[in-house]
Amino acid sequence: MAQITLSATVQPQQMGQRLDQTLAELFPDYSRSRLKTWIEEDLVLVNGVVQNVPRTKVYGDEHIEITVEIEDETRFEPENIPLNIVYEDDDILVINKPKDLVVHPGAGNPKGTVLNALLYHYPQIAEVPRAGIVHRLDKDTTGLMVVAKTIPAQTQLVRDLQKRKITREYEAVACGIMTKGGTVDEPMARHPTKRTHMAVHPMGKPAVTHYRIMERFRDYTRLRLRLETGRTHQIRVHMAHIAHPLLGDQTYGGRPRPPKNASEELMAVLRNFKRQALHAVMLRLQHPINGEMMEWYAPLPDDFVELVTALKADYVLHKDELDY
């Protein structure tokens, strides 16, 4: 078991909410049922006083503190899975995750994950909640992730994520020809009928994605995106919501379609690109222990480079036929 302390301040816009609902928003890494249990077990302090009634209303600006014992991750099997380490010190490591690698074990993926690899290469990380994983990438999204090697580092990184102090930027290829960048500010929640999907929903959690155009091709647009929040599938759902799903994203409507009179080469590349075209290209954060500002970049993976190269060659071949 490992002891952790979570702390946060109730925001003014949360005034009138139930305590358990507020905690779910302040500490999104933990389930609402777990947070409710902690309330009922006298583990939640509100302005220094134990509060054990989940339906209690909050008023804004209260200081919340929770000190709990968390099960370590020894129930998962360590596995000798290679990790591409971009940076490492005593407190954190940054990895460049490949495609086809799930971050955390779950239904349908009991092993063969980033977490299993971390337990093998860093046995002591079993003492850290979630083996130090503070944010995730989807199975077929590539790129940068930060992992905490100690409980103090994990606690601070989670806090910084909640305060939106960690910058995460992505490159993507979206379906359709986009004319300008912008921001998608639409709340998100679990899809009402497809439980493995997410959806824009007026009663969901706040979700904000900024995007700008890097390059236009025939029928596709290359984007640079920045997450202001970090909801599950956020970029994929937001881009689909504005009718520009990510190329290759079968879940949210981005099935590749070759442009008119496309070359055999481009059609082959599109046919063989069997994931969403999304890569976590940049990560910027303040070191959780020494406070140093740090920044990393991950080059596009080979399949993404091949995709962009083929789309660019097709655009050059047909640009005289275009009116944009």
Label each PLM-derived region with a short phrase.
Residues 2-324:
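RNA pseudouridine synthases
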